[in-house]
Swiss-Prot record:
One of its GO terms (cellular component) is ATP-binding cassette (ABC) transporter complex. Its EC number is 7.6.2.11. Keywords: ATP-binding, Cell membrane, Membrane, Nucleotide-binding, Translocase, Transport. Part of the ABC transporter complex PotABCD involved in spermidine/putrescine import. Responsible for energy coupling to the transport system. Belongs to the ABC transporter superfamily. Spermidine/putrescine importer (TC 3.A.1.11.1) family. CDD domains: ABC_PotA_N. This is Spermidine/putrescine import ATP-binding protein PotA. The gene is potA. It catalyses: ATP + H2O + polyamine-[polyamine-binding protein]Side 1 = ADP + phosphate + polyamineSide 2 + [polyamine-binding protein]Side 1.
């Protein structure tokens, strides 16, 4: 098995008031992938980034880079660079000198600096902007300058601390494509932190979902979206319908007063569970044809779909994304298939969750 590029082994970070920001965190980062640390403010994602960068020390535990323990290695000796949320550009320097700054500090020859800065500008599509003042650049252009300044030093890892948060929605979407494309061109490891689940789903090879100093679940965007480990992940990653249920037996679950075939298994008979169905997986139909009968409460037009909120006979609330319209107050049916149902156990560890999925997916 290939050695991880970065490893955290039982890392804890505490402050003087004994508040634990990271609680026994362990994970591996492989070379050449795009990773996202995803979670709300205060979950510990920025602390992980700072420990990797050498800007903060772990209270206990070990951090490895290329198989070597780096807890005591200073920040300037680590093969990582950081793009900060505010970009941290020098306003008194033009674009060229901002990008060249780190190379000059390292006393790289002038001709080599010019070659590397020119290549970095080409990579971020800012050819010809060498003499432009930072104050004359748009938000998206400033971000590209910050990225060029980071990649010009040939890091093995690029750390990105919520760099899209200050941009408007359209520009954020454009920069998601650009960052993903740039990572593939460079072939280096990107570690991106955000609280925006859409950014994480769009760009990542792997996502680490954090909450309260713990990594709750890790996996590909598809795995985490389709098979969240618990209520927190299901609710945080996209919109979800989450209702209480009973796992009758393998591939049969009860919720909303009825039993439905599903694709989940490996649980105890009649075990209390939570059931997730994504809004886009619910299909509007007539009450007679629907597996669930519901009453429409409200409807909003969102451009690409209608957002329809409904209530079933037991009081469960359902959110539906549909291209079909519904009328508030009318009774309708909701249709879905076994593969649209995801069943979650209470208090299941990620290790047990992965083992259970493997047991019935093989």
């Amino acid at each position: 098995m290939k050695q991880p590029l970065i490893s955290f082994k039982h890392v804890v970070k505490s402050y003087d008031d004994d508040v634990q920001v990271l609680k026994d965190v362990s994970f591996d980062i492989e070379e050449g992938k795009f990773y996202t640390l995803l979670g709300p403010s205060g979950c510990g994602k920025t602390t992980i980034l700072n420990i990797i960068a050498g800007l903060s020390d772990a209270t206990s535990g070990d951090v490895y880079f290329d198989g070597k323990r780096i807890n005591d290695v200073p920040a300037n000796k680590r093969q990582v660079n950081t793009v900060f949320q505010d970009y941290a550009l020098f306003q008194h320097l033009n674009v060229y000198d901002n990008i060249a700054f780190g190379l000059k500090i390292k006393k790289v020859p002038a001709d080599k600096i010019k070659e590397k800065v020119t290549e970095a500008l080409r990579m971020v599509r800012l050819d010809g902007y060498e003499d432009r003042a930072i104050s004359e650049m748009s938000g998206g252009q400033r971000q590209r300058v910050a990225i060029a300044r980071a990649i010009v030093l040939d890091p093995k890892v690029l750390l990105l601390d919520e760099p899209l948060s200050a941009l408007d929605q359209k520009l954020r979407a454009e920069m998601q494509y650009e960052l993903r494309s740039l990572q593939k061109k460079l072939g280096i490891t990107f570690i991106f932190i955000t609280h925006d689940q859409e950014e994480a789903l769009a760009m990542s090879d792997e996502i680490f979902v954090l909450n309260n100093g713990n990594i709750v679940q890790s996996g590909t965007p598809v795995d985490i979206y389709d098979e969240p480990i618990n209520h927190y992940v299901a609710d945080f990653i996209g919109e979800s319908n989450i209702v209480n249920g009973i796992m009758i037996k393998d591939e049969l679950v009860e919720f909303a007063g009825q039993q439905f075939p599903c694709v989940d298994g490996g649980m105890k008979p009649n075990e209390p569970v939570e059931v997730v169905i994504r809004p886009e997986d619910l299909v509007l139909t007539s009450p007679e044809k629907g597996q669930l009968k519901v009453k429409v409460d409200t409807q909003l037009f969102r451009g690409v779909h209608y957002e329809i909120r409904c209530t079933d006979a037991l009081g469960n609330k359902w959110l539906v994304h549909s291209t079909k319209r519904a009328v508030p107050g009318e009774n309708i049916g909701l249709s879905f298939g076994p593969e649209d149902i995801h069943v979650m156990r209470f208090n299941e560890s990620e290790e047990d969750f992965d083992a259970r999925l493997d047991s019935y997916n093989d």
